[in-house]
Amino acid sequence: MSIIRDVYAREVLDSRGNPTIEVEVYLESGAIGRTIVPSGASTGAFEAVELRDGDKGRYLGKGVQKAVENVNQIIAPEIIGLDAVEQVVIDEMMIELDGTPNKSKLGANAILGVSMAVAKAAAEALGLPLYQYLGGVNAKQLPVPMMNILNGGAHADNNVDIQEFMIMPVGAANFSSGLRMCVEIYHNLKSVLKEKGLGTGVGDEGGFAPNLGSNEEALQVIVEAIEKTGYTPGVDVKLALDVAATELYDETEKLYRLSGEGVVKTAAEMVDFYEELINKYPIISIEDGLSEEDWDGWKLMTERLGKKIQIVGDDLFVTNTERLEKGIKQGTANSILIKLNQIGTITETLDAIEMAKRAGYTAVISHRSGESEDSTIADVAVAVNAGQIKTGAPARTDRVAKYNQLLRIEDMLGFTAKYLGEDVFYNL
């Protein structure tokens, strides 16, 4: 019933107008799985390789025809005839077929496209929603949104150094209420910015991208928007940051350059800076507060702040069990950001989440800045009971698609749906 009959890939566009790969898997039963692979702007050096063509005369070198060809001519013949429910077997076969530690031969984008499409096809063949197929009967926890409403860094053309300023509706009773709270705050933030004569254009992930006097001013206008909406900062809504500090790090001088503020800081001074911010504002989570290779700095940050806030490793861990294991052994961070295309298969993604949870780390499921209408990560978040999701502002269809899928899942789960609010930070 779930035997793979055909696999087909094509080149499509992502939310930034860059080419990406779409894969379709057809089963003998008539079931079809279709998925579009995302792409990042601020990427970790240790991520699996996203294969691009490099032909400057076509899509400025960003075409993915090589990845498409690898699916259609190399991967497809190997997996046609296999059972789509054998996810681990298929993923491991593709990893072996690639034969490199970072999937640079076939491309993580090619491999992930097939991996996700296989899972979707198998779920359809069995008549199950994807979250239940991947997570089983216990998949019932809706994630707290970590909604990016103000963009800086590599996600915007402004003078704000910190890449993402996010809100988390920890006081909501359920997911739909939490989403509504975030949307209301987002619209009120637009009003606050307009009143101050600031720009309301948006960045890659739909958050506003104004020029501000400092990174702290971003927190100030967000708190103002929360209060204007009628919610209490720190009670109903908490704040989260993605600093993307690797983008700020001068490898030669071992210093962090906050160009927007015209200052340079050591790792210890960055930790001091974060401590000042969390003492003044209701910040519950900081992602990539230091560079991906500044392990000593990360250890210091975890020692200083790890009992107060969630410290998330994105570029640090890149959804990779080897790097996560190193972090766990060193006592580095207390949370991992999960991006499927950083590692390249469903199986390896689930392995990373399992390792994190066993070590008492939280797991945050995340989109990329280059997204599409594909909503797979919404199902993954519920499948693994992650409890948190990053998928941008309520302003672009590529972001809203994930929120809408979570609303559908909440409806499907009915009274069995869970929403933990602040209890998702179980290790603080």
UniProtKB/Swiss-Prot annotation:
Cellular component GO terms, alphabetical: cell surface; extracellular region; phosphopyruvate hydratase complex
Family annotation (HAMAP family): Enolase
Transmembrane feature ranges: none
Active-site residues, as the UniProt record annotates them: E205, K339
Reaction catalyzed: (2R)-2-phosphoglycerate = phosphoenolpyruvate + H2O
Name listed for the protein in its UniProt record: Enolase
Compartment(s): Cytoplasm; Secreted; Cell surface
Domain of life of the organism encoding this protein: Bacteria
Cofactor binding, per record: Binds a second Mg(2+) ion via substrate during catalysis.
Record has Chaperone as a keyword: no
Disulfide topology: none
Cofactor(s) listed in the protein's UniProt record: Mg(2+)
Ligand binding (Mg(2+)): D242, E287, D314
Family according to the record: Belongs to the enolase family.
Pfam families on file: Enolase_C (PF00113), Enolase_N (PF03952)
Presence of keyword Flavoprotein: no
Gene3D superfamilies in alphabetical order: Enolase-like C-terminal domain, Enolase-like, N-terminal domain
An example Gene Ontology biological process: glycolytic process
Name of the gene encoding the protein in the UniProt record: eno
Known EC number: 4.2.1.11
Keywords: Cytoplasm, Glycolysis, Lyase, Magnesium, Metal-binding, Secreted
InterPro entries: Enolase, Enolase-like_C_sf, Enolase-like_N, Enolase_C, Enolase_CS, Enolase_N
